[in-house]
Amino acid sequence: MTVVLDRRKSENLWGRFCNWITSTENRLYIGWFGVLMIPTLLTATSVFLIAFIAAPPVDIDGIREPVSGSLLYGNNIISGAIIPTSAAIGLHFYPIWEAASIAEWLYNGGPYELIVLHFLLGVACYMGREWELSFRLGMRPWIAIAYSAPVAAATAVFLIYPIGQGSFSDGMPLGISGTFNFMIVFQAEHNILMHPFHMLGVAGVFGGSLFSAMHGSLVTSSLIRETTESESANKGYKFGQEEETYNIVAAHGYFGRLIFQYASFNNSRSLHFFLAAWPVIGIWFTALGISTMAFNLNGFNFNQSVVDSKGHVINTWADIINRANLGMEVMHERNAHNFPLDLATFEVSATNA
């Protein structure tokens, strides 16, 4: 009899736990994805803060030339970064217990791999948690689908690109200047500015910013007047009121006269779907571009594509970009190799014995 009571009590405890985890009445929804998201993101954030402040220099290139990235080793907020895991480790799984000591783990950049893997798992669970809450509230799944764009972008630069290049040392450093360094080296090695998927991403980000600003300014300008013309229209409203405060027909008419009739939306749902889809699709394409360039399917190469009647090269903008790429590449990892691959290849002219 005691066993039955204990089992019933434990089942009730587990049932209450399940109800609490999946309850939509909590101030912050947890969900089953949240059970994994919370510890992974807390771990990634904690290790990031500690490493950004106090991590010792990391031998990123695997040539016994450590690079300092933390605040206590001479960096500031702008120059500081979590240095990627050493090229000596490559793509190996490198938890703390695989190193001979904590000092060795830090020297080889173990914190970077720990942070990145926990972070990617955490943001993926955050996306799943968005879907889970939407499902329980009877909503459609578009919020999680939209969030998949930044998740795909982060996965591309922190995981897919290192896999394609063969080492976590090629991943994006976790810092401001480290991000810029990653962008410069990426351009030098893959000519990303000439990749059509990157161009679509630029159109998505800048276009999304433009459309967001246009929509916000139209909405805040198209107030339904609740006062006389001698009073401010703002007096007719309370901040946070439930009643609708703007007229989409008026906004549609204004914008249609500003450009042309069919340049504006007269349907609110179509408008907001467009505002969501434009940047999301653009960032999807950028993540796909990074993932293809990870395996060296690079941007277009139009170098020396224009010649005169005598075969002399007429430089175009593509040749200027190529020259800049070579300059950036020759300065990158200058002690790790004698020449970049592009500069080390040449044709041997035939000679008569």
UniProtKB/Swiss-Prot annotation:
PTM notes: Tyr-161 forms a radical intermediate that is referred to as redox-active TyrZ, YZ or Y-Z. C-terminally processed by CTPA; processing is essential to allow assembly of the oxygen-evolving complex and thus photosynthetic growth.
Annotated residues for binding of Fe cation: 215, 272
Enzyme superclass (EC): oxidoreductase
Keyword Transmembrane applies: yes
Enzyme Commission numbers on file: 1.10.3.9
One term under GO cellular component: chloroplast thylakoid membrane
Residues engaged in binding chlorophyll a ChlzD1: 118
Membrane topology: Multi-pass membrane protein
Quaternary organization: PSII is composed of 1 copy each of membrane proteins PsbA, PsbB, PsbC, PsbD, PsbE, PsbF, PsbH, PsbI, PsbJ, PsbK, PsbL, PsbM, PsbT, PsbX, PsbY, PsbZ, Psb30/Ycf12, at least 3 peripheral proteins of the oxygen-evolving complex and a large number of cofactors. It forms dimeric complexes.
Family: Belongs to the reaction center PufL/M/PsbA/D family.
Protein's UniProt name: Photosystem II protein D1
Organism from which the protein derives: Cuscuta gronovii (Common dodder)
